[in-house]
C-alpha cells in the first residue's frame, strides 16, 4: 500500500514525499511567520502560487525535523527517482490508460495528464491560500487557518483547515459525518480492509473544549458591544439608613432589590404593571415582591434594571443591629402598626 501511494503521489507532481513533508512540517511549526514557507500573511497570491515563483533562500525557511523520512527506504527511493517517476506516473501512465483502454491517446494526454495536473495543483494550492483566508476558526483564531465547506469542496476535503492545524496528528480534516472529506473516507476504508492501521484521532473532549472556548470568546466580544450598566463591584456602598433617608428627604426614586439600589425615576411611567407599584416600593426592600411575592419578573426586566444601578447596601439590606434606634422599625407604617 505504501508503495502504491508513493507512485500515485509522484503522479500528482507536487514534489517528493521528503520535499513535500519538509515544507508542510515547516508550515505547521512556523505558521504565519516569516519562516512559514507559504505564509498567508504575505498575501493570497504568495500563499497560493507566489512561494514557488519567487524562490526564497532555504535559510529563510524554518527548520523542520525529517529524520524519520531520511531513515525510510521507500521515501528515499522515491526522492532519488522522483524525476523519472513524475514522467512515468504523471504523464505516461494516465495517457496509456486512455490510449490502451479506449484508443484516445490525445485525450489521455490532454485531459488525464495535463488538465488533471492543473486541477490537482490549484486544488492543493488552495489549501495554502483559500483555507487561510475564507471561513472561521471554530477551534482557535490566533492563526490564519480557517474552516469552510467551499474550500473543502475545492480541495477534495482539505477545507476544514482550522481543525487540521489545531489537531495535526488527527487523520481527519472534517470530524462530522456530513462534512465533505473524501480523504478521510478513503483512509477509513483502507483501515477497515486492513490496508492502514494506527489511525490517530484527537480526544473528543479536547476537541469540544476548543470549540466551547471559541464560542465563549465570541460571546464576550459581542457582550462588549452592549450596555450592561455599572458593575456591582464598582458601585458605591451605602447603609440602609442612608438609602431610606435619600428617598424620604431627598425625593430619590430608589428601590432596593437583592442588596442593590436602583434609580427608577425615569422608568416609573413606563412600568408595564403601572406606576403605583414602583411608588409603593420606593425606600423599601422589594426583593421578595420582585421575585414572586407580587410578580416574578423576567430576565428582560433584570437586564433593564442593570442600567439603573446606583449603589449597593452595606450588609445587603436592613440589619436590626445597625439601626440608630432598634426599637423603631424603619420599614414603613405597616411594620410600625404591626409592632
Give short role names for the model-derived ranges.
Residues 240, 253-254, 260, 264-270, ...:
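Non-catalytic interaction/regulatory modules that flank or connect domains
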Residues 36, 267-286:
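Short, surface-exposed glycine/acidic/tryptophan-bearing loops
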Residues 73-82, 133-146:
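Interhelical loop and helix-boundary elements at the membrane-water interface
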Residues 18-34, 127-141, 152-171:
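Histidine-centered catalytic micro-motifs
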Residues 149, 157-159, 274, 286:
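A short pocket-lining beta-strand/turn micro-motif at the edge of beta-sheets
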Amino acid at each position: 500500500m505504501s508503495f502504491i501511494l508513493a507512485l500515485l503521489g509522484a503522479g500528482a507532481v507536487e514534489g517528493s514525499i521528503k520535499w513535500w513533508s519538509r515544507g508542510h512540517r515547516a508550515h505547521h511549526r512556523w505558521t504565519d511567520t516569516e519562516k512559514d514557507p507559504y505564509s498567508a500573511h504575505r498575501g493570497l497570491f504568495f500563499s497560493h502560487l507566489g512561494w514557488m515563483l519567487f524562490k526564497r533562500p532555504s535559510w529563510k525557511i524554518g527548520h523542520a525535523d525529517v529524520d524519520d523520512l531520511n531513515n525510510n527506504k521507500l521515501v528515499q527511493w522515491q526522492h532519488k527517482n522522483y524525476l523519472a517517476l513524475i514522467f512515468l506516473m504523471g504523464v505516461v501512465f494516465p495517457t496509456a490508460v486512455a490510449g490502451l483502454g479506449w484508443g484516445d491517446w490525445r485525450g489521455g494526454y490532454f485531459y488525464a495528464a495535463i488538465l488533471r495536473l492543473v486541477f490537482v495543483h490549484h486544488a492543493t494550492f488552495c489549501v495554502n491560500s483559500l483555507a487561510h483566508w475564507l471561513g472561521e476558526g471554530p477551534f482557535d483564531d490566533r492563526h490564519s487557518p480557517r474552516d469552510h465547506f467551499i474550500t473543502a469542496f475545492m480541495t477534495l476535503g482539505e477545507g476544514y483547515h482550522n481543525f487540521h492545524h489545531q489537531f495535526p496528528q488527527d487523520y481527519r480534516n472534517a470530524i462530522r459525518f456530513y462534512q465533505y472529506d473524501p480523504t478521510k473516507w478513503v483512509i477509513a476504508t483502507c483501515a477497515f480492509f486492513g490496508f492502514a492501521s494506527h489511525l490517530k484521532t484527537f480526544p473528543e473532549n479536547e476537541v469540544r473544549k476548543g470549540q466551547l472556548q471559541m464560542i465563549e470568546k465570541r460571546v464576550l466580544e459581542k457582550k462588549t458591544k452592549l450596555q450592561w450598566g455599572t458593575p456591582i463591584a464598582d458601585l458605591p456602598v451605602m447603609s440602609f439608613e442612608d438609602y431610606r433617608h435619600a428617598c424620604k428627604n431627598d425625593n430619590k426614586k430608589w428601590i432596593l432589590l437583592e442588596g442593590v439600589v436602583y434609580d427608577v425615576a425615569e422608568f416609573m411611567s413606563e412600568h408595564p404593571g403601572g406606576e403605583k407599584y414602583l411608588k409603593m416600593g420606593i425606600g423599601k426592600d422589594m426583593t421578595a415582591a420582585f421575585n414572586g411575592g407580587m410578580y416574578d419578573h423576567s430576565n428582560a426586566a433584570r437586564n433593564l434594571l442593570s442600567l439603573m444601578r446606583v449603589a449597593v447596601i452595606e450588609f445587603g439590606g436592613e440589619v436590626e443591629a445597625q439601626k440608630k434606634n432598634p426599637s423603631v422599625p424603619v420599614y414603613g407604617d405597616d411594620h410600625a402598626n404591626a409592632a
